[in-house]
């Protein structure tokens, strides 16, 4: 009986010790979760249908090479896939055919001829989307209701006035209080989406003149996506541990490498740049310019002078 009582006491002590142990562990876990500030999950959004690029707006030699002439429209994902699978080596580097047939700037060609293919600066599959996007060109005009409208960045006011004159869009006098509001039909929205790759922002087929002006400004703006960028100062390469190549008086690095290096300096939970990074770039980026990664990239680089080759 005494032995049984001793066993009960032993079990009782073990239970209390075990309870205290687990309680302490649970408290530690809760504290860690509270201080960690777990990032919120993004709300899942319905996937938008992919826009088809009209065949006449895709580089003609590319269309012929892959037999796309009879397509009603070419998905950009198909262009991406064809570029990735036909113009790169097994090691993921741009091959000689790609250098000849894809759209490269003169600077890009000079850099590729200067560096070794094994260099991290060499164009690789991470640049597929940029190269694929260059195979499509912006429309210079669109047709609607028997009228042809020309797209010129410095003549957008004339374009809107012509749309009104032709009654392709109509002034909504009731809604026009602070700004002129126009009724834009679904048929015209479809034409713009197909030819210009994006739709204007409308609500119940109503759009303001300001929004319409901004829309045409964006779609007529030249795409200046770059694979290589010029650093404002050689010290930037040291701060961010970037590979570089010097061409004349300019020091180049890959845009993707610079973006990734800056992104790695963003705190995962606070979404702000690390304080040490602020100190390192203070000379090049003003405090009010540290808005996001894209803005910092702009501040650390010199605008490229783009001269394209292989365009049609």
UniProtKB/Swiss-Prot annotation:
It comes from the Viruses. This is Telomere-binding protein OPG077. Each virion contains approximately 670 molecules of OPG077. GO terms for cellular component: virion component. Induction: Expressed in the late phase of the viral replicative cycle. It holds the Pfam family Pox_I1. DNA-binding protein which binds to the hairpin form of the viral telomeric sequence. Required for the production of mature virions (MV). It is found in: Virion. InterPro entries: Poxvirus_I1. GO terms for molecular function: DNA binding. Belongs to the orthopoxvirus OPG077 family. Keywords: DNA-binding, Virion. The keyword DNA-binding applies.
């Amino acid at each position: 009986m005494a032995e049984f009582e001793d066993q009960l006491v032993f079990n009782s002590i073990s239970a209390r010790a075990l309870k205290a142990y687990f309680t302490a562990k649970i408290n530690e876990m809760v504290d860690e979760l509270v201080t960690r500030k777990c990032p919120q999950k993004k709300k899942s959004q319905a996937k938008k249908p992919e826009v088809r690029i009209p065949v006449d707006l895709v580089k003609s030699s590319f269309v012929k090479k892959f037999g796309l002439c009879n397509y009603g429209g070419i998905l950009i994902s198909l262009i991406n896939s064809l570029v990735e699978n036909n113009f790169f080596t097994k090691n993921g580097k741009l091959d000689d055919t790609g250098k000849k047939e894809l759209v490269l700037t003169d600077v890009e060609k000079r850099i590729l001829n200067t560096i070794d293919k094994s260099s991290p600066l060499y164009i690789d599959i991470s640049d597929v989307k940029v190269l694929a996007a260059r195979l499509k060109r912006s429309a210079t005009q669109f047709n609607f209701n028997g009228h042809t409208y020309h797209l010129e960045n410095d003549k957008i006011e004339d374009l809107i006035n012509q749309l009104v004159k032709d009654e392709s869009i109509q002034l909504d006098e009731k809604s026009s209080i602070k700004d002129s509001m126009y009724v834009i039909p679904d048929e015209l929205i479809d034409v713009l989406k197909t030819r210009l790759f994006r739709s204007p922002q409308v609500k119940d087929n109503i759009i303001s003149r300001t929004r319409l002006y901004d829309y045409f400004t964006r779609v007529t703006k030249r795409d200046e996506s770059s694979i290589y960028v010029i650093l404002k100062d050689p010290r930037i390469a040291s701060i961010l541990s970037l590979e570089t190549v010097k061409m004349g008086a300019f020091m180049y690095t890959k845009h993707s490498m610079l973006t990734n290096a800056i992104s790695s300096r963003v705190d995962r939970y606070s979404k702000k740049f690390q304080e040490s990074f602020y100190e390192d770039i203070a000379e090049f980026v003003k405090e009010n310019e540290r808005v996001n990664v894209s803005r910092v990239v702009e501040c650390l680089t010199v605008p490229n002078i783009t001269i394209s080759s292989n365009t049609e």
